A protein has these predicted regions:
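Alpha-helical solenoid repeat scaffolds, predominantly canonical TPR units
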Residues: 214-217, 221, 258, 265, ...
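C-terminal transcriptional activation/regulatory domains of eukaryotic transcription factors
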Residues: 107-108, 112-114, 119-234, 241-251, ...
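Eukaryote-biased recognition of C-terminal alpha-helical segments
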Residues: 522-567
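Intrinsically disordered, low-complexity transcriptional activation domains
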Residues: 68, 74-88, 92, 485, ...
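Classical protein tyrosine phosphatase
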Residues: 249-265
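Intrinsic, low-complexity transcriptional activation domains
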Residues: 1-161, 186, 190, 209, ...
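Amphipathic alpha-helical protein-interaction segments enriched in hydrophobic
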Residues: 232-240, 286-289, 351-358, 410-431, ...
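Fungal transcription factor middle regulatory core
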Residues: 65-69, 73, 80, 85-126, ...
Length: 593
């Protein structure tokens, strides 16, 4: 970058220009348009709390209109469920600095691909499906036969439930066949419709009409005002599952709203409390735990994915115990003695480990949303806490230990847990990596030379990306992935691939690691085009990588403003020749995997 600066502005001293940017007063062009900061009533002490307020501005893509963050997801979709490809901020809701799209925006801006937007969005056309689905009074039996229902329920429990066991299978099946009484009619119908819709989604059939009909039927059941005037465990289960299905259908804000309602309803039911004196059965108590921790991991994960604060209660206000690591046959409605937990993995091991992960790390995700950013020292300190958590995992989840067996549900739970761990590590060091690559001093504690810790931070971030790519490639090479496995594989490997892109583009060709980074990118593209060849989002992601790495001259490059974080306005990007941004899904949206 120094060479480019010297070529374009030979009479300007780079170091002096940077120093000038950091010394500008309150009325300078770089700060005059800043909004007042909201008071922070519960800030975690940081050595960088007042340093370099502009450090996170590179991530703040804002629409031109005051209502530009408004969203309407029953229209043609502008958002993607992974919050990784929606570069244009208008119509997608606010996506903060832990969202994957933050990385993509910053990377594209750093490359100088776009500087202003001259054309507005095309008029959004209401989806025909939105007009056709007036299903509130339609009986479920008119949509699908009893035999098809049974097949969809099997699909749900064989594919989705083994990853997210929030619904007790034996109880649900007994209620479905009316062997035991069903819960409140409307909440049960909403849960049944959502389970059927997820079962259809898991089948990944080319004909999506059945999946669409079942999804909209579940939505219509939730539109009745009586649904928000009552609360029960079945309704919370339905909301949790409906939120996740909405996200998988590229309706992230719709899903987020369902999660918000589910959290409030769960709190009203006391699911976050153990209540040991309550005279309920062991299975009923355990099911309350499973629903609470299922909601906890979904809301935590979605908030981090969308770059929004996690508003769940912390350990200081929760006393509900973790889910038991037991097999289903060990706990039935008639069980009166608490079963002993097994030392081997069960369907509930992944839920238990991931809920522990979020309890211990949610403060990290929230800290990363700070407007002032974090210092390298604080990032390394938080990483140590993250590393300490990983060492507390049971041996069957330790990456250094061989798997105890090779059943697919266990291998996926084990792999996904580490993909999530490495992804948070990538996010943790992202600001440092971007600042280093852009040739700008990132935040550091007072008295510390700005680049002393750069290499350590970069190495941790790049290693996390490399381990993600290797692990995902190995996993997909050994199995025929289910649709839910494919979705998470694309999500995590795309984030990791952008780290490698940044490392390659920031390197001057002298790094001995360059061939390894290039090999990792080739692995990612092979995963997208071969191991996930039937996944539309994988194909789009591979195309994005090709476009990013395609040589393109920088036209009209303003070096001084490029170095000024306050000038990073992503709302002013053009849809230029070839329309790079159209491949991100906001002009030509496609269905999720």
């Amino acid at each position: 970058m120094e060479t480019l600066f010297a070529q374009r502005l030979p009479d300007v001293n780079l170091e002096e220009a940077i120093a000038t940017l950091h010394s500008e007063g309150p009325g300078s062009p770089s700060t005059i348009n800043q909004s007042p900061r909201t008071p922070d009533f519960n800030a975690i002490p940081s050595p960088s709390a007042t340093a370099h307020v502009n450090a996170s501005k590179m991530s703040e893509a804002v629409p031109q209109e005051a209502d530009g963050f408004d969203w309407q997801e029953d229209f043609s979709e502008l958002a993607d469920g992974m919050a990784a490809l929606s570069v244009e901020p208008k119509g997608t809701g606010y996506l903060g600095s832990t969202a994957g799209v933050f990385f993509l925006r910053s990377l594209l801006l750093w490359m100088g691909r776009s500087t202003s937007i001259a054309t507005a969005h095309e008029a959004v056309v209401r989806s025909p499906k939105a007009e056709e689905h007036n299903l509130s009074s339609m009986a479920l039996q008119s949509l699908v036969s009893r035999q098809v229902m049974a097949s969809l329920i099997d699909s749900y429990f064989n594919v989705y439930h083994v990853s997210y066991p929030f619904v007790h299978e034996a109880t649900f099946r007994a209620q479905f066949h009316e062997i035991i009484p069903r819960p409140s009619h409307r909440s049960w119908q909403m849960l049944l419709s959502t389970v059927l819709a997820l079962g259809a989604w898991c089948m990944n059939h080319p004909n999506t009409d059945l999946h669409d009909d079942l999804y909209h039927h579940a939505l219509s059941l939730g539109e009745d005002e009586s649904m928000v005037e009552s609360g029960n465990l079945t309704f919370v289960q339905a909301l949790i599952l409906l939120s996740n299905l909405s996200q998988k259908r590229n309706k992230p804000n719709t899903g987020s709203n369902f999660l918000g309602l589910a959290v409030r309803m769960a709190l009203s039911l006391g699911l976050y409390r153990e209540l040991p004196d309550w005279d309920i059965s062991l299975l009923q108590r355990e099911q309350r735990r499973r629903v609470w921790w299922g909601l906890y991991i979904f809301d935590s994960g979605a908030s981090t994915t969308f770059g929004r604060p996690i508003l769940l209660p912390g350990p200081e206000s929760m006393d509900v115990r973790p889910v038991l690591n037991i097999h289903d046959e060990s706990l039935t409605p008639g069980t009166t003695n608490l079963p002993a937990e097994t030392t081997l993995p069960t369907l509930y091991s992944g839920l238990r480990a991931q809920s522990s992960f979020h309890v211990q790390t949610n403060h990290i995700s929230n800290r990363l949303l700070s407007a002032s950013g974090i210092s390298k020292e604080e990032a390394l300190s938080l990483d140590q806490a993250l590393d300490s958590w990983s060492k507390s995992l049971p041996s069957y989840f330790q990456i250094s230990q061989a798997p105890v067996f090779y059943e697919q549900w266990y291998m996926f739970a084990r792999s996904k847990l580490w993909w999530r761990f490495w992804n948070l590590r990538i996010i943790l060091f992202l600001q440092v990596l971007l600042g280093r690559s852009m040739g700008r001093s990132n935040i550091t504690a007072a008295g510390k030379p700005p680049y002393v810790l750069d290499e350590t931070c970069r190495n941790i971030c790049v290693e996390a990306a490399h381990l993600s790519i290797v692990s995902i490639h190995q996993y997909l090479s050994q199995v025929v992935p289910t649709r839910i496995e494919s979705w998470y594989a694309v999500f995590f490997i795309f984030h990791a691939s952008l780290v490698m892109v940044l490392a390659i583009l920031a390197d001057d060709g002298s790094s001995p690691e360059l061939p390894s980074w290039q090999a990792d990118l080739e692995t990612v593209k092979s995963v997208f085009r071969h191991l996930l060849s039937n996944n539309p989002l994988a194909a789009r992601s591979a195309d994005i990588l090709d476009r990013i790495l395609r040589p393109e001259p920088v036209v009209g490059f303003d070096a001084i403003n490029f170095l000024d974080p306050a000038s990073f306005d992503f709302s002013q990007w053009p849809a230029g020749d070839g329309d790079l941004l159209s491949s991100f899904g906001w002009l030509d949206p496609g269905q999720g995997p």
